[in-house]
């Protein structure tokens, strides 16, 4: 069992600093890539990725004038009730049905 946490994305949300949030996201991406590479070599490994909460409610969009300029803005400096994503990388050997009473 290995758990990896990246507090950088949380700090970026609390501080309303998109550049910090992006840096943390890139670090998580690197960690996930490493875990998936390991799982591909060791087919009894399951990789799960999620977050414990969302912070800042970052929104992104594009302007009309000038066209296509990226705009990023936060709605808060606190944790939000927004749902977070859950991803899994499953090999054929680790794929099986888990009765819902055993899933948290």
Per-segment meaning from a language model:
Residues 1-104:
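A post-motif C-terminal structural segment
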């Amino acid at each position: 069992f290995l758990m990896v946490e990246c507090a950088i994305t949380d700090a970026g949300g609390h501080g309303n600093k998109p550049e910090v949030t992006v840096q943390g996201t890139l670090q998580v991406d690197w960690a996930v890539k490493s875990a998936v590479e390991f799982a591909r070599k060791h087919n009894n490994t399951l990789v799960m990725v999620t977050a414990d909460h969302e912070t800042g409610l970052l929104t992104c969009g594009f302007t009309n004038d000038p066209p296509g300029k990226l705009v990023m803005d936060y709605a808060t400096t606190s944790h939000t009730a927004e749902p977070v994503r859950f991803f899994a990388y499953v090999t054929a050997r680790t794929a099986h049905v888990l009765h819902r009473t055993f899933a948290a």
